[in-house]
Regions:
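Short, hydrophobic beta-strand segments that form beta-sheet elements in well-ordered domains
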Residues: 31-33, 90-93
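Acidic, metal-associated active-site segment
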Residues: 73-90, 96-104
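Residues at the C-termini of beta-strands that transition into short coil/loop
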Residues: 35, 71, 113
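Acidic, PIN/NYN-like endoribonuclease modules and their adjacent C-terminal/linker elements
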Residues: 99-123
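Short acidic-hydrophobic, aromatic-tinged amphipathic segments that line or gate anion-handling sites
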Residues: 66-73
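Short, surface-exposed amphipathic charged segments that create phosphate/polyanion-binding patches used
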Residues: 46-47, 83, 122-123
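Domain-level signal for Mg2+-assisted phosphodiester chemistry and nucleotide/NA-binding surfaces
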Residues: 1-64
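Residue-level detector of structured alpha->beta connecting loops
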Residues: 27-30, 87, 106
Length: 123
């Protein structure tokens, strides 16, 4: 399962208990974080805004997964590449355009439903 920056920021921005919800849905899973997503979080973490604070938490949460390097420099592109190559069965995101790209590519998406719950959307 691969994690997007928006998913890693959700515990702060949406009060989602990310890892508890993932375990509820799918049990224990191997979590992947593309290096490009980690770099995106590091860029967003600069400053004193609420988004920066959420990105700092998200960056810390990447430690719970395995960082993987891809040839893609953009986080969304890296997630699509991992999933379509079969390296990630699901992608967790709150990003609507990424969600649509993944579903169009036949990849199941774990996304927020309501304020604090995650659900699986199948293609």
């Amino acid at each position: 399962m691969a994690l997007d920056a928006s998913a890693l920021m959700a515990p702060v921005e949406r009060d989602v208990r990310l890892f508890e919800e993932l375990e509820r849905l799918l049990g224990e899973v191997d979590l992947l974080v593309p290096a490009a997503v980690r770099a995106e979080l590091d860029r967003l973490a600069a400053g004193a805004s609420a988004e920066a604070a959420a990105a700092r938490v998200g960056s810390d949460l990447t430690e719970r997964g395995r960082t993987v390097t891809t040839s893609e420099r953009n986080g969304d592109d890296a997630l699509v590449a991992l999933a379509t190559a079969g390296e990630a069965e699901y992608v967790v995101t709150a990003d609507r355009p990424l969600r649509d790209r993944l579903l169009d590519a036949g990849v199941p998406v774990v996304e927020t439903r309501g304020r604090t719950r995650l659900e699986i959307t199948e293609p």
